[in-house]
Amino acid sequence: MSLSDDVVTLRPWSRDDAGFIADASGDPAIQRYSVPHDRRGHPSPPESIAAAEALIEEFAANWRASAAMGRPSGVTFAITDAASGELAGLCGVDAWSDEDVVQIGYWLAPRARGRGYATRAVILLTRWLFELGAARVFLTIVAGNQPSVEVARRAGFVYEGTMRSHGVWRDERCDVMWFAALPTDWTHR
């Protein structure tokens, strides 16, 4: 299963992508802001190719489980440049609740930032989730991650508030910002 807008393509991960994940995971911004601050099933960045391979296997297992459940909870896409196929980052569904509320997340490798890939990936993913019946799609951002805030806003998400001391990073509390989109008011239908 792939999604594309002719600029970015979202596709399942393959074992050949492990080196990219391991390299990107060394980026300080990914380490800082991709922590499992409040996401169920959101993995910490892997620190080796072997750990990245194991994570890709976990991604594949999540796809199989989601197919059996009939909704994409825990599925993860590789973000790639549609023309070249170059890997750019990750986006996915962290959780799909019984109430059809869906949490998503994303990150980009340093070399892919500033090209609009994250915004396009979030729009593609959100559109697909609404087509599948999501009643609400939300994302959480560790306070201070301004580039991610800009992605959320450009992708049509509305800031709903900051939960103070909601998450934990390196044994310290951190504030978490909440953004959401509803199918009734989302601007990128």
Where are these regions (language model features)?
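Conserved hydrophobic/aromatic "anchor" residues
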Residues: 13, 77, 128-130, 157
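Conserved GNAT acetyl-CoA-binding A-motif
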Residues: 131-141
